[in-house]
Regions:
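NAD(P)+-binding Rossmann beta1-loop-alpha1 motif at the extreme N-terminus of oxidoreductases
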Residues: 1-71, 94-97, 133-137
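Interdomain hinge/lid region at the active-site interface
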Residues: 183, 208-213, 220, 228-298, ...
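C-terminal amphipathic alpha-helical interaction region
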Residues: 401, 406-485
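Glycine/threonine-rich flexible loop motifs
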Residues: 72-89, 104
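Small-residue-rich helix-loop
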Residues: 224, 348-380
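Rossmann-fold dinucleotide-binding core
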Residues: 8, 83-86, 101, 107-220, ...
Length: 485
């Protein structure tokens, strides 16, 4: 290639990389591709990319040389060391103002570090969350870019051309914030995804083991739920899974081992919440539910040792299914309320000016948690951009309050039947705790002060003053120096 022709380049031709490259080219942007295993480049150029505006490079030097300036390079390689290694190989080949874009599932602290490093070399960096899986990459993903602000105007037209669209035609891509903001928001998205899936599984379990419903009956329930306030991608595919049979007519969902896998992004979200002191209880329970499912053999053994087994439901099944619908929706509100609390805390910690309504819009299409519900979140932040918690918005306050009785009936019935509802239950516990003007933490502080002299605050004194009681008469007045009010 004698003169640079490609608007953008992409490194990493696994399925996600191929699909994203095809998406970019289909929107009118000539693109160069490279892969460490060069045979993949040839196979792609001579296969899915044949006859299209692609340039397949066999070396990084050739790849970089094929790009128009400022060069824009998407890296779709395995998160972790591989990203750092690729950056080190690319930096010497680039010039001031060129842009590196990490489109993988990188941990946001790594993106913060990489942004600082790349900027120190006179280059620009973007860490962008990409949601929607392989199909989304091809047809339109949800994109959550963050990093060097100066890079956004250079890539905005490409990103907003290839991303998904809301039903109103708005692009599901907007600038999130500096350094690691984009990957942080994608991490929270993944955590919410964990919670949504676990809550759906809990309603399925209550219908399956509690009500004794067939997969066909549950398929019909989820079909109906997807027409209303629960309309979402995950409800839609739950419906499809419950109705799916293999070539022998067997219901596939019943053949799948009940031991869940995970890639770690849910854990990252929970750890981030702990670091910021945020009560991300529902998503934490979703992560631990997967951990518990993974000890399959232990559970099977315990089921033979610990009685009684799950009881059968007696009562009005149709009414209970309606209660489940209400409990799922109310719990979903709590899950998003917690996720947004975490993003607000991170915004303060890392000095990100996050657009919370804009984030809801970005999630409205193309991504795994896309749902009609997100439109209501966007409206909530339009009403009040400084909204502290979704539970305080008039729409969501009414939505939860009107479902409280049904929500509580579901939790009680689950406990009576012996069917675990960790996420639905933790959502209700958070709701009750958040609306309590007094919690038993006063006793907790007294106990901490008793055994560790950690001190406490008093209700009759200004906040921030520390007090210690010599509870036994033998402890003296020395207090813990590690306590932070």
């Amino acid at each position: 290639m004698s003169t640079p022709q490609s608007e953008i380049g992409l490194i990493g031709l696994a399925v996600m990389g191929e699909n994203l490259a095809l998406n970019i080219e289909s929107k009118g942007f000539p693109i160069s591709v490279f892969n460490r295993t060069t045979s993949k480049v040839d196979n792609f150029i001579n296969g899915r990319a044949q006859g299209k505006k692609f340039f397949g490079a066999h070396s990084l030097e050739e790849f970089v040389g094929s790009l128009k300036r400022p060069r824009k390079i998407i890296m779709l390689v395995k998160a972790g060391h591989a990203v750092d290694e690729l950056i080190e190989q690319l930096v010497p080949l680039l010039e001031q103002g060129d842009i590196l874009i990490d489109g993988g599932n990188s941990h946001f602290p790594d993106t913060i570090r990489r942004t600082q490093y790349v900027e120190s070399k006179g280059l620009l960096y973007i860490g962008t969350g990409v949601s929607g899986g392989e199909e989304g990459a091809l047809k339109g993903p949800s994109l959550m870019p963050g990093g060097s602000p100066a890079a956004w105007p250079q890539v905005k037209n490409i990103f907003q051309a290839i991303c998904a669209r809301t039903p109103d035609g708005e692009p599901c891509c907007e600038w999130i914030g500096e350094n690691g903001a984009g990957h942080f928001v994608k991490m929270v998205h993944n955590g919410i995804e964990y919670g949504d899936m676990q809550m759906i599984c809990e309603t399925y379990d209550l219908m399956k083991r509690g009500l004794g419903m067939t997969n066909e009956e549950m398929h019909d329930v989820f079909t109906e739920w997807n027409k209303g306030e629960l309309d979402s991608y995950l409800i839609e595919i739950t419906r499809d899974v419950l109705g799916y049979k293999d070539e022998e007519g067997k219901e596939v969902v019943d053949l799948i081992l009940d031991a869940a896998g995970q890639k770690g992004t849910g854990k990252w979200t929970v750890v981030a919440a702990l670091d910021d002191g945020m009560p991300l209880t529902l998503i934490a329970e979703a992560v631990f539910a997967r951990c518990l499912s993974a000890v399959k053999e232990e559970r099977v053994a315990a089921s033979q040792e610990i009685k009684p087994r799950v009881k059968k439901f007696t009562g009005d099944k149709a009414r209970f299914v309606n209660d489940l619908r209400a409990a799922l929706y109310a719990s979903k509100i709590v899950s998003y309320a917690q996720g947004y609390q975490l993003m607000r805390a991170a915004g303060k910690t890392y000095q990100w000016n996050l657009n919370y309504g804009g984030i809801a819009l970005v999630w409205r299409g193309g991504c795994i948690i896309r749902s009609a519900f997100l439109g209501d979140i966007k409206k909530a932040f339009q009403r009040n951009p400084e909204l502290v918690n979704l539970l305080l918005d008039k729409f969501f306050k009414k939505a939860v309050s009107s479902r409280q009785a049904a929500w509580r009936r579901v939790i009680v019935k689950g406990a009576q039947l012996g069917i675990p509802t960790p996420c639905l239950s933790s959502a209700l516990a958070y709701f009750d705790g958040y609306r309590s003007d007094r919690l038993p933490a006063n006793l907790l502080q007294a106990l901490r002060d008793y055994f560790g002299a950690h001190t406490y605050e008093r209700v009759d004194k200004p906040r921030g003053q520390a007090f210690h009681t010599n509870w036994t008469g033998r402890g003296g007045t020395t207090t813990s120096q590690t306590y932070t009010v």
